[in-house]
Amino acid sequence: MTVNILTGFEKINTIINGCITAEMVENGILADVETFVNTYYEEGQVEEPVVWITQHPTTVSKGADISKTLLLKTPFEFDCGVYEVEIEDANTSSQNLCNRVILSILKNWQTIQNTELEGKRMIRNIELDRYMPMGYVPVTGKSDKVPITGVILNVYHMINWQQCCQQINNGD
């Protein structure tokens, strides 16, 4: 069973964020992560290791008719940084963190989806779009820089427009 637009657009971000936070526990894949930023702008101090998530615009993957079920694509970008004294070590550590983020998504998305949607299936597939050592950001108060590695994962999910219209017509 698919979900309607009211649920689908709200839950996609919750599910993907949940995949990361589920592993930011003792003995988790991301236990060492100090900061998880899930907004576009962070005003506070960012401690590393850091994972920064950005949800990009959702587009129709195929079939743009809004009178039926749509397959949508929502790209999520994860930018990961780890400080090490040696820049080569920091680069390797940032790439390792990025790899563990991918693993966290793959490990948890089905379980979290089942919990959030009470057994309904919304996410159909998650694919790697691109993996990129993006560059460096300066460290406040130091001449050092932290290498950042990024990955974009495309999350394909279904929305049932008809179900939404039926619920509105029925007053649900």
Q: How would you label these PLM feature ranges?
A:
Residues P49-I53:
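A short glycine-rich, His/Asp/Glu-containing loop-to-beta-strand
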Residues Q45-E47:
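A short, polar/charged loop/turn motif at coil->beta-strand junctions and beta-hairpin connectors
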Residues M1-E43, H56-D172:
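Charged, amphipathic alpha-helical segments and their flanking helix caps
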